[in-house]
Amino acid sequence: MLYFYTGTDTKKARGEMNKEIARISKGGERVVRITDANSVADFTASLQGGGLFGERRIVILEGLSENEEMRDLLFRSLAQMQKSEEPFFIFEPSTDADARRTIEKYSASKNRFDAPKKEKDNSVFALANAL
């Protein structure tokens, strides 16, 4: 099962993702978190399954599209993650539209949380700040 969270409001997106993780966890699962700072070998190992004893896991993949090697492996593994019994959570704070659409195509749940746009400062001091 694949869950996808994205958007510029990272605090809200993370909060909603953590709520969903808490909802589906039964207490005995191990949480595996892979970020762009991990190695490709770590990511590959997380795709292999629960190991010798069939340990149930929740896998969180965070910001992998920032790392070029991991990005390629992520896109090649989407179908495998979609069919998996283990829940996979993908959190991408900022990703391009093509990557977002590709991940959404395989996701059972897609959630986007964008921060409200800030109004442009039209005050008299804006000119002084520009100098």
Can you say where each PLM-predicted feature lies in the sequence?
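Non-catalytic interfacial helical region
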Residues: 2-131
